[in-house]
């Protein structure tokens, strides 16, 4: 039995709160059950040096976790003077996922940076970050359209992500920490709102998984992401 008696294909309750902070062009608190991530999108009329003069924009991301987002305190990475490998991997994943649904040529020389800060972690922080960042980025782009700095929407659709895995021989969608820590297979799937794959990260932590099990996991991810996209659209419609 899953926590909260969820069905195997059921995602955790989602809450997306827009305009969560006062200053960012896009600000979202996204909650997947007990996992909570603050996603702030910042607009700069500037691009990295290597993009200057090309008439293209850029989307990037940063990821971090508050020291007491977990059961025991984690030391701030700033205190050690460098980011950890996991942090760098996750923020690159978030940025790639966001860029996959943006026409950078339409942006002109504008950069959007989305900061994803985990304030409470109960599994699926990177997937929650991507799903929340998509809404924050949409709000930031809408602010550019409203101000006339953009004439056309460069965002081609939503992007969302979910974790899936095999726990006790059962394929499950949207793993909580207690499930993730016991999983034989753990996978993160990122997709566009029309069901196209952006990234699949999958590892057999224990028993190797079969092709049939892979297809089961991808089917669960497809349904879960469709449910997340519905929540994203509903939040933006408010």
From Swiss-Prot:
Enzyme class: transferase
Annotated disulfide bonds: none
Primary role: Phosphorolytic 3'-5' exoribonuclease that plays an important role in tRNA 3'-end maturation. Removes nucleotide residues following the 3'-CCA terminus of tRNAs; can also add nucleotides to the ends of RNA molecules by using nucleoside diphosphates as substrates, but this may not be physiologically important. Probably plays a role in initiation of 16S rRNA degradation (leading to ribosome degradation) during starvation.
Family the UniProt entry places it in: Belongs to the RNase PH family.
Reaction catalysed by this enzyme: tRNA(n+1) + phosphate = tRNA(n) + a ribonucleoside 5'-diphosphate
Keyword terms: Nucleotidyltransferase, RNA-binding, rRNA processing, Transferase, tRNA processing, tRNA-binding
Keyword field contains RNA-binding: yes
Protein name, per record: Ribonuclease PH
Gene Ontology terms: biological process: rRNA catabolic process; rRNA processing; tRNA processing
Keyword Mitochondrion: no
Pfam families recorded: RNase_PH, RNase_PH_C
Residues annotated to bind phosphate: 86, 124-126
EC number: 2.7.7.56
UniProt GO molecular function: 3'-5'-RNA exonuclease activity; tRNA binding; tRNA nucleotidyltransferase activity
Assembly with partners or alone: Homohexameric ring arranged as a trimer of dimers.
């Amino acid at each position: 039995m899953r926590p909260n008696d969820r069905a195997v294909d059921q995602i955790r309750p989602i809450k997306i709160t827009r305009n969560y902070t006062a200053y960012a062009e896009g600000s979202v608190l996204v909650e997947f059950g007990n996992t909570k991530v603050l996603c702030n999108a910042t607009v700069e009329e500037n691009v990295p040096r290597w993009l200057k003069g090309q008439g293209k924009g850029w989307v990037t991301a940063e990821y971090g976790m508050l020291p007491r987002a977990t059961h025991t305190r984690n030391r701030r990475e700033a205190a050690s003077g460098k980011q950890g490998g996991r942090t760098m991997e996750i923020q690159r994943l978030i940025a790639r996922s966001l860029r996959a649904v943006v026409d950078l040529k339409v942006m002109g020389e504008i950069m959007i940076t989305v900061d994803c800060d985990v304030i409470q972690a109960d599994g699926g922080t990177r997937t929650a970050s991507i799903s929340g960042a998509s809404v924050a980025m949409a709000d930031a782009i809408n602010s550019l359209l409203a101000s006339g700095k953009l004439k056309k929407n460069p965002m081609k659709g939503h992007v969302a992500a979910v974790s899936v895995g095999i726990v006790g021989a059962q394929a499950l969608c949207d793993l909580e920490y207690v499930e993730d820590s016991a999983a034989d297979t753990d996978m993160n799937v990122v997709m566009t709102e029309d069901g196209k794959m952006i990234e699949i990260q999958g590892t057999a932590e224990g028993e190797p998984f079969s092709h049939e099990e892979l297809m089961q996991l991808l089917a669960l991810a497809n349904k879960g992401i469709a449910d997340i996209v519905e929540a994203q659209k509903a939040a933006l419609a408010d």
